[in-house]
């Protein structure tokens, strides 16, 4: 039958996500280092997440909420818009098992523009909407991960459906015997 999102502990979820990101940097460092499109990176990460979360579906750019398009309310803009999350870990057709939602940004360390910062702010606003259970049609994701991918490190902000909680992780490639592959 599988595991529900309420049976997995946060520390186990965080470990699985970090293991997937480590695998991405190890096996696919070439696409990160050579400025390949962000969608290519998210696709590869989704594969590694699927290997970790075998009882779940892992989808990229998935825009359905049951039979309806996925929408969230943007409080700052007072609008309700369709959204296309970068990656989700969920069980299709079961809103009660929406586990993790990812928004991912690839960052060129030498060229952080105002547009990049504006897009990052918008992605974080979307994440808060995904985990906010007070929306008109709540999506009820348990965790929202904002992942910023740099050539030599990554940065994660984790949002919980309990608005008072947030976790931050920064990992440099030299940390924890972190290794890269040139393949």
Each predicted region: which residue ranges?
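Short secondary-structure junctions
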Residues: 49-58, 138
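Nucleic-acid nuclease catalytic cores
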Residues: 131-162
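Mg2+/Mn2+-dependent nuclease catalytic core
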Residues: 109-131
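Conserved catalytic cores of phosphodiester-cleaving nucleases, focusing on short active-site segments
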Residues: 86-89, 98-110, 127
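Charged, often low-complexity linker/regulatory segments
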Residues: 1-50
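Active-site metal-binding core of divalent-cation-utilizing nuclease and nuclease-like domains
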Residues: 57-95
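Non-catalytic C-terminal interaction segments of nucleic acid-processing enzymes
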Residues: 166-183
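Surface-exposed cleft-lining segments at the edges of enzyme active sites
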Residues: 28-34, 74-76, 108-114
């Amino acid at each position: 039958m599988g595991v529900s999102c309420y049976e997995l502990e946060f520390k186990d979820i965080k470990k699985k996500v970090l293991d997937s990101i480590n695998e991405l940097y190890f096996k696919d460092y070439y696409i990160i280092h050579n400025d390949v499109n962000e969608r290519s990176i998210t696709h590869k990460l989704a594969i590694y997440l699927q290997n970790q979360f075998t009882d779940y579906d892992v989808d990229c750019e998935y825009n359905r909420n049951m039979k309806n398009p996925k929408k969230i309310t943007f409080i700052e803009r007072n609008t309700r818009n369709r959204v296309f999350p970068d990656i989700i870990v969920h069980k299709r057709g079961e809103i009660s098992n929406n586990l993790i939602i990812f928004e991912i940004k690839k960052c060129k360390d030498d060229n952080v523009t105002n547009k990049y910062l504006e897009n990052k702010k918008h992605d974080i606003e979307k994440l808060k909407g995904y985990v906010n259970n007070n929306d008109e049609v709540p999506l009820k994701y348990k965790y929202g991960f904002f992942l910023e991918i740099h050539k030599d490190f990554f940065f994660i902000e984790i949002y919980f459906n309990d608005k008072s909680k947030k976790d931050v992780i920064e990992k440099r490639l030299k940390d924890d015997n972190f290794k890269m592959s040139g393949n």
